[in-house]
Amino acid sequence: LGGSISTEGDGLYTEIVEVETWEDLEALGREQVEGKIVFFNEPMNPENTYTFHSYGHCVQHRWGGAVEAAKYGAVGALVRSLSLRIDDFPHTGSMKYDEGIPQIPAAAVSTRGAEQLSQKLKDGEQVKVFLQQSCQNLPDKQSYNVIGEIKGKKNPENIILVGGHLDSWDKGHGAHDDGAGVMQSLGVLELFKIL
């Protein structure tokens, strides 16, 4: 996950515990979490017609899961990928650390991987996970924005702003995030030209 620290040495090999909510984590407490990897497995709700509501609800575990797990002595965090599809592709995204809380490594697991892990745990198996990652945060680099402007003939002082970001995560090619957003922005501009 973007912002995660690396695993130290040869990585982590330890038991995992599964939670869906912050309340689940709290109910387990330090006694059942310490020294383990916390697996945040809250699926996105497919009933929402506006899927960003489902994403917005679950993203809290990716963003803050490592912090909350570390408060209970966890040594790592795994987060179910934020997708309605069941597939083998772990998604990336950003996460954070809080000052004064130990930093633990965090990673995403594909939705299919999450389903399989969860089933093994439900079957009563003691599941151990090997996690090794070599993350690094590099110094900031200057980047640039692409800006286009079309002045209206009528009411040119009024502004309609349309945008998307041109960067993408290193894991993918950027077609979805944010190639799709860029194409939608261009489509809006094309519609404005027609109007």
Explain the meaning of each model-derived region.
Residues 1-37, 41-49:
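Noncatalytic luminal/extracellular "stalk/propeptide" segments of secretory-pathway proteins
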Residues 1-18, 99-149:
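A non-catalytic alpha/beta surface segment that caps or lines the substrate-entry region
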Residues 110, 142-167:
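Acidic/His- and Gly-rich active-site-bordering loop/insert found
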